[in-house]
């Protein structure tokens, strides 16, 4: 499946430690709700602002909360037609789409769907962790959603990076340092193999109720992890 060459960079309202990289011309930057304030602090103007604005006051846009009602849940952007019918306005001259706060998709996932609809395949989630543990876990699930769609997703913490892989392998250069963990996001991950790390693992099964894959280490050699069947979270030091 082909897609756009650039990255879809989504900045949320969670803990923000600055941008891990500067957006390139071909990248598409989306502010998820009050993530717009994080981008302003970094001096970056997004291509799009998306949110229900229950955490940020915007002139002409009223953010509210309300009781949850039953809504259809769609597995892909093409079927999630609501993203084509969002209320449109502008915030400081930037295109803005307003989401009904009574919804199943959190703002970050809505941004991902829009990026998918735009043709992007690489998603970088910044400001997606913090004091709301439920939001942090939800963003890990967004990584799993992306992996199931055949996309690449990355969630940035202050010192660590998280990504999800599904039925594939990932190689790391010998320059990598620090800790490396592999945790099952699926009920089970079968055929997990880790080579070139401090602890060698061959064709094991990991499950999501036992943190067996915690705290391996890079050792200055090329390393590889693979999973034959399942969605695996990879967490590793990136600074």
Language-model-detected regions and their locations in the chain:
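Long, charged alpha-helical interface segments
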Residues: 160, 165-239
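Short Gly/Thr/Asp-enriched flexible loops that form oxyanion-binding sites at enzyme active sites
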Residues: 133-144
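Short, acidic/small-residue loops that bind anionic groups at enzyme active sites
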Residues: 145-162
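Short glycine-rich or small-residue beta-strand-to-loop segments that form or flank ligand, phosphate
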Residues: 97-98, 123-128
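Non-catalytic positions within long, well-ordered alpha-helices that form the structural scaffold/packing
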Residues: 40, 116-119
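Short phosphate-binding loop-to-helix
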Residues: 70, 74-92, 96-117
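N-terminal beta-strand-loop-alpha-helix module at the start
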Residues: 1-82
């Amino acid at each position: 499946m082909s897609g756009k060459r650039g990255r879809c960079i989504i900045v949320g309202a969670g803990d923000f430690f600055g941008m891990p990289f500067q957006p390139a011309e071909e990248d598409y930057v989306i502010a998820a709700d009050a993530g717009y304030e994080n981008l302003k602090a970094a001096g970056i103007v997004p291509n799009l602002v998306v949110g229900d604005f229950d955490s940020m006051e915007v002139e002409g846009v009223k953010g509210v909360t309300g009781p949850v009602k039953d809504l259809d849940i769609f597995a892909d952007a093409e079927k999630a037609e609501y993203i084509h019918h969002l209320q449109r306005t502008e915030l400081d001259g930037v295109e803005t789409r307003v989401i009904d706060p009574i919804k199943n998709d959190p703002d970050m996932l809505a941004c991902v769907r829009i990026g998918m609809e735009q043709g992007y395949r690489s998603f970088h989630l910044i400001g997606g962790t913090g004091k709301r543990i439920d939001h942090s876990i939800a963003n890990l699930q967004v990584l799993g959603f992306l992996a199931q769609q055949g996309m690449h997703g990355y969630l940035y913490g202050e010192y660590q990076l998280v990504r999800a892989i599904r039925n594939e392998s990932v190689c790391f250069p010998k320059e990598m340092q620090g800790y490396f963990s592999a945790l099952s996001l699926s009920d089970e991950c079968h055929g997990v193999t880790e080579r070139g790390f401090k602890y060698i693992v061959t064709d094991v099964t990991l499950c999501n109720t036992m943190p067996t894959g915690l705290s391996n280490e890079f050792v200055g050699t090329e390393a590889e992890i693979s999973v034959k069947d399942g969605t695996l979270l990879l967490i590793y030091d990136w600074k």
